[in-house]
Amino acid sequence: MNSKARSLLWTIRRFSTLLPRSRALRIDPLGTCRPEVIHSKWNPRNHRLNVFDEGLQPSVRYLFQDIFISKSVDGCIQTKGISHSAVFKPDRLLCPRRLSFDAKHSFVSDGTSDHDLKKINFHHTSSEDVFTKKVRPTPVNYKKLAQECNSLSDVLDTFSKAPTFPGSNYFLAMWIIAKRISEDKRRFERQLMFSHPAFNQLCEQMMREAKIMHYDHLLFSLNAIVKLGIPQNTLMVQTLLRTIQERINECDERCLSILSTALVSMEPCMNVNALRAGLRILVDQQVWNIKHVFTLQTVMKCIGKDAPSALKKKLEMKALKELGRFSILNSQHMFEVLAAMDLRSVVLLNECSKVVIDNVHGCPFKVLISILQSCRDLRYQNEDLFKSIAEYVATTFDIWKLKQVIFFLLLFETLGFRPPGLMDKLMEKVVQEPGSLNVKNIVSILHVYSSLNHVHKIHNREFLEALASALTGCLHHISSESLLNAVHSFCMMNYFPLAPINQLIKENIINELLTSGDTEKNIHKLHVLNTCLKLDESTYKSVHIPLPQLPLSASQPNEKLAEVLSRLLEGEGRFSRNVPLPHNYHIDFEIRMDTNRTQVFSFSDVDASSATNMQRVAVLCVPKSVYCLNSCHPRGLMAMKIRHLNVMGFHVILIHNWELKKLKMEDAVTFVRKKIYSDEVLPTADTTV
């Protein structure tokens, strides 16, 4: 056997292995090449909503497979080993055959003629040929159908009366109708759709047409089917995924956008994962050819967090290249896109932030929330962006619902940003309308204000009393955990409402908190409650809640600060490090000085230790996280610790570890000397770090 014959046989065998359901182009009567599907294994009696079986499990080999070609015939490429089949070069298949199907019949090739189709009756066991002919009815317009029908069942009724090709139009019409009705009605309509007698027939037709319809129609169908809530593990959905995977080389820029939109809303499974892998390969090849920013962002959102770093970098460079063409919507949407990719591109975020700041007025609630959530997920802190959003919400305060304002503040709290103007506005509203608050609102407001340590200059007492009164009215139906969260926040703000605390310290409530839910977090908050009741001015100093001991937290004082103190105080005998204190507190360093803070005493000096004019000084080396964003305003836990250390007789000095880290040793000694030997008052208002 010569080499050419061996090569031909090898090609035929490889082709049959790679393509168990072969795709070819047959010569149309008009002389054009159109694709036709040759099914090797297809059972039309299978129920189309059965769970996807093993026979259709995905395989990576279906991604980007090539068709083996041997010679050219009249503008097409003739393949050997496939009878009467002509195919184009495999970069894209054109002009799919338009056929008409009804719910009872299907068309397949009989394998003997290029132009004839055999009609098989699915509801009869006989395989006898009935007739052979070509039908070209006018396809239904899905937009017109969506206007004429008022429900999903109406669309299925229309289909059952006169089914036409393509079936995708019926699913598109149903999705358009579903989008314009309420969620409750949509849920009811979906149940009626599943039980409609024509639904299974439409699924059968959709599966039969998948191989021959236009690729973009196929993708639109998948998107509509997924959005309609048809289970992803059904045979129809998995068949569409498999077919899309096999035909992925037909994907152009428009198809990339549609496919990405569909995949974003789908749960991971074997076929989805294989299709997403194929999409990544395709995007990697075509990224520089993408012309529309919207398509680029849709693809980036679909790529996912686990995409290769090289692909993420390539998409980032493409986005930076297109930055000048970004619209306002593109800039707003870019935050969500980068969060979906887990790509913290500071350059892109900074440029898009400028656009958002300039156009924040009139920006919808969902867009602003999405931007803040993305900043949280990406750990991106832009004070100017946060200020512009907070000021916009504060100036338009009356147009927002209470729960929307609270949602903004919860996100600002997670970002460590304190917006005083907006928080003062909400405090005034709470004082004026305490009856409008429910339990969830009360707990959320208390959490934000205690965490950010915000105090109103005028209405602070009235604000706390209004919240306490509203909480007291909810005690009969509040959960133990919500009550603990509320009282914990009150204690952090040095306020002790009688009724809520009396309810919380009941034995059955304490036992419930110690045995259910997040017990570790509950125990920590109860310890804070015990500490506040003992140290702060309250009527509950004699109350003690028996609790398990908290685990000792390993704390290593800053070594550079230890060396600075050793040089400054001329030896380690004049300070003590990592000092444990009552109530689960500890301090990094303790220094003993006179009340004027001009002289340092040695720890070995017994007379100095008992002197009445001695002042204990607590030196704490703190990170930026204990302050609100870009300020020296301490957050709630640090403010409470400072308050309690003062009660225990300490003067507190805070050393910023990020400032100390930048200084040389000589400069660091000078920096700490000014902190220790001065009467500097700890900041309680905003100052720039």
From Swiss-Prot:
InterPro entries: FAST_kinase (IPR050870), FAST_Leu-rich (IPR010622), RAP (IPR013584)
GO biological process terms held by the UniProt record: apoptotic process; mitochondrial large ribosomal subunit assembly; mitochondrial translation; positive regulation of mitochondrial translation; regulation of mitochondrial mRNA stability; RNA processing
Membership in a protein family: Belongs to the FAST kinase family.
Keyword rRNA-binding assigned: yes
Protein name: FAST kinase domain-containing protein 2, mitochondrial
Origin organism lineage: Eukaryota, Metazoa, Chordata, Craniata, Vertebrata
Domain RAP: from-to ranges: 617-674
Keywords assigned: Mitochondrion, Mitochondrion nucleoid, Phosphoprotein, Ribosome biogenesis, RNA-binding, rRNA-binding, Transit peptide
Free-text tissue specificity from the UniProt record: Ubiquitously expressed. Expression detected in spleen, testis, colon, heart, smooth muscle, kidney, brain, lung, liver, brown and white adipose tissue with highest expression in testis, heart and smooth muscle.
Single GO molecular function: rRNA binding
Keyword Transit peptide: yes
Highest taxon, organism lineage: Eukaryota
GO cellular component: mitochondrial nucleoid; mitochondrion; ribonucleoprotein granule
Chain positions found as Phosphoserine: S113, S126
Cell compartment(s), UniProt: Mitochondrion matrix; Mitochondrion matrix, Mitochondrion nucleoid
Chain's role: Plays an important role in assembly of the mitochondrial large ribosomal subunit. As a component of a functional protein-RNA module, consisting of RCC1L, NGRN, RPUSD3, RPUSD4, TRUB2, FASTKD2 and 16S mitochondrial ribosomal RNA (16S mt-rRNA), controls 16S mt-rRNA abundance and is required for intra-mitochondrial translation. May play a role in mitochondrial apoptosis.
Any Pfam family hit: FAST_1
Subunit structure: Monomer. Found in a complex with GRSF1, DDX28, DHX30 and FASTKD5. Associates with the 16S mitochondrial rRNA (16S mt-rRNA). Forms a regulatory protein-RNA complex, consisting of RCC1L, NGRN, RPUSD3, RPUSD4, TRUB2, FASTKD2 and 16S mt-rRNA.
